[in-house]
Amino acid sequence: MGTVRSRRLWWPLPLLLLLLLGPAGARAQEDDDGDYEELVLALRSEEDGLAEALQHGATATFHRCAKDPWRLPGTYVVVLKEETQRLQPERTARRLQAQAARRGYLIKLLHVFHDLLPGFLVKMSRDLLELALRLPHVDYIEEDSYVFAQSIPWNLERITPARYRADEYQPPNGGSLVEVYLLDTSIQSGHREIEGRVMVTDFESVPEEDGTRFHRQASKCDSHGTHLAGVVSGRDAGVAKGASLRSLRVLNCQGKGTVSSTLIGLEFIRKNQLVQPVGPLVVLLPLAGGYSRVLNAACQRLARAGVVLVAAAGNFRDDACLYSPASAPEVITVGATNAQDQPVTLGTLGTNFGRCVDLFAPGEDIIGASSDCSTCFVSQSGTSQAAAHVAGIAAMMLSAEPELTLAELRQRLIHFSAKDVINEAWFPEDQRVLTPNLVAALPPSTHGAGWQLFCRTVWSAHSGPTRMATAMARCAPDEELLSCSSFSRSGKRRGERIEAQGGKLVCRAHNAFGGEGVYAIARCCLLPQANCSVHTAPPAGTGMGTRVHCHQQGHVLTGCSSHWEVEDLGTHKPPVLRPRVQPDQCMGHSGASTHASCCHAPGLECKVKEHGLPAPQEQVTVACEEGWTLTGCSALPGTSHVLGAYAVDDTCVVRSRDVGTTGNISEEAVTAVAICCRSWHLAQASQELQ
């Protein structure tokens, strides 16, 4: 698709009626590329037209890319509400065309979505946006925008666990039970690396190239796609050497595509899945554009249908949350590292980072198939290559355990990653705590990991600076929220709590007056057959503090949190020389409400670990022993200079203000409290399967 704008045409009524009643108005016309299009100029009655539309308030919203050079004004994705019927997108599109015709505009209907999301793609004048937003059933409209390829043999050694490394790469399986869809440029399927492993589909939806009116031949435009196909499943340089690939062309010869083309490609995959259900599917999205609500929504729909999506974080040395599909929570988002496990730098740019990145993977000077000849190889760099590595690892994990859910796969990828190997100084200071220090690696064995209690840390977006501002973090649908904490760089916060929203528990953090904003931090775990609840004690007002415990029989404590309404709890000095938290009890400041997260699950046992220091420290940590998993992390209790607490792998970290910058030296204790759990039931079930 190009960026051709619709033109406003004033039609004399007799001529308009002639067009409608004649053959030219009754049949579709062919556009310049030979595609079949329909120009509807039908007049409809006032009762069924604008008058009806204007009765409805414009409750729909309009979205567009935040980066102006990437925008495609004149092309729009109109998304309808989820409860609309299957035929409603066509009806709404034709209603819009009819109402536009009465105003002298032509609208070109480019595509109708059914299987991915209810909606349609149109080319029209921006003048018609208000009219379209007022149509019944419309949820939101998004202006189309560009997406870009993200590429500018140490890599195979790097993803092999250290104690299993040999002179050559020996993966546990080839990923042969998994099909990988690659949305990219075209592919040279005859290259010896991927010959017989790639099926080039007939799907092609790409924009015109800059500076030319005509597309180049696809065979001359397959460098990026061929290289990535080789990284995923190449005979010599591939990660999952047995995985089969299907290629969809959504990027042109310049490595440029559009959001709408990507949407149509994802719908193509969903249609194939419905028509011919197969084994596990992995979709590799080695592209990035500006934040797109509709693209993220499409990824969510596909993920909930059982498809694993792996995306490049982006090569803009920026927060990955500003780009799509990297910002979609249901997507496994991958940043890039080099042979020294450091973030990849690409000229003045480099890998994206931040809370939307799940993990990093090799992405610099990656050797792979070249489109120059059927036996040529080439080196490429970028988060596209990093994402291809993770797609290959995912294929092998799914081949070993085809029933893995997306949540289970993501947790395993995180658990088996190499930890704390990246130099965080490369990232902006405000992003270091948010960016995972994880580099992807194959598990020692693709079997037998089921006994582990897997947990991960999920950070919210930063809240606003107002006193009543809040931040919210949530877990994936298949995960349990076992604890909630908060963090503020200024230290001005009012704590956190777990609350129910839409049938799921969420973690909500509260900013304080004069604060710069706050983060909510959820600890999300895989705990089958769990029954979890939250017990709250109001502020005690006096005494040593507010206490609450798990009073239901068989429930164990998995997390503690507190929140308060006052701006400053003041100082509170709990004793340091004796244990302060019982195995089933939380303690908070006497002026705070305290919450205990309590769970019952077969074989679940938990214990509390503490580490306290009598003088202010910038950081205090306490870790769980091997075989135990951190489910809760909190600071004890309510010290005025504590910035917050958060989990890093199985370590609880409590951060405090630098006393050198505050000018005040306090003798308040800083205590980190970790709740460590394990499940005997999971271990027993895993042994029975082996």
Curated annotation (Swiss-Prot):
Please name the catalytic residues of this protein: 184, 224, 384
- The Inhibitor I9 domain covers 75-147
Q: Which UniProt keywords apply?
A: Apoptosis, Autocatalytic cleavage, Calcium, Cholesterol metabolism, Cytoplasm, Disulfide bond, Endoplasmic reticulum, Endosome, Glycoprotein, Golgi apparatus, Hydrolase, Lipid metabolism, Lysosome, Phosphoprotein, Protease, Secreted, Serine protease, Signal, Steroid metabolism, Sterol metabolism, Sulfation, Zymogen
Enumerate the residue ranges of region (C-terminal domain). Answer: 448-690
For the keyword ATP-binding, the answer is no
- Keyword Cytoplasm carried by entry: yes
| Biological processes per GO annotation | apoptotic process; cholesterol metabolic process; low-density lipoprotein particle receptor catabolic process; proteolysis; regulation of neuron apoptotic process
InterPro entries for the chain: PCSK9_C1 (IPR041254), PCSK9_C2 (IPR041052), PCSK9_C3 (IPR041051), PCSK9_ProteinaseK-like (IPR034193), Peptidase_S8/S53_dom (IPR000209), Peptidase_S8/S53_dom_sf (IPR036852), Peptidase_S8_subtilisin-like (IPR050131), Peptidase_S8_subtilisin-rel (IPR015500)
Enzyme Commission number(s): 3.4.21.-
- Which Pfam family is one of those matched by this entry? PCSK9_C2
Which residues are tagged as glycosylated in the record? 531
Please state the span of the N-terminal signal peptide per the UniProt entry. Answer: 1-28
Q: Which residues carry this modification: Sulfotyrosine?
A: 36
Boundaries of every Peptidase S8 domain copy: 153-459
Quote the entry's note on domains. Answer: The C-terminal domain (CRD) is essential for the LDLR-binding and degrading activities. The catalytic domain is responsible for mediating its self-association.
What's the subunit arrangement here? Monomer. Can self-associate to form dimers and higher multimers which may have increased LDLR degrading activity. The precursor protein but not the mature protein may form multimers. Interacts with APOB, VLDLR, LRP8/APOER2 and BACE1. The full-length immature form (pro-PCSK9) interacts with SCNN1A, SCNN1B and SCNN1G. The pro-PCSK9 form (via C-terminal domain) interacts with LDLR. Interacts (via the C-terminal domain) with ANXA2 (via repeat Annexin 1); the interaction inhibits the degradation of LDLR.
Physiological role: Crucial player in the regulation of plasma cholesterol homeostasis. Binds to low-density lipid receptor family members: low density lipoprotein receptor (LDLR), very low density lipoprotein receptor (VLDLR), apolipoprotein E receptor (LRP1/APOER) and apolipoprotein receptor 2 (LRP8/APOER2), and promotes their degradation in intracellular acidic compartments. Acts via a non-proteolytic mechanism to enhance the degradation of the hepatic LDLR through a clathrin LDLRAP1/ARH-mediated pathway.
Which family is this sequence assigned to? Belongs to the peptidase S8 family.
- Kindly provide the name given to this protein in its UniProt entry: Proprotein convertase subtilisin/kexin type 9
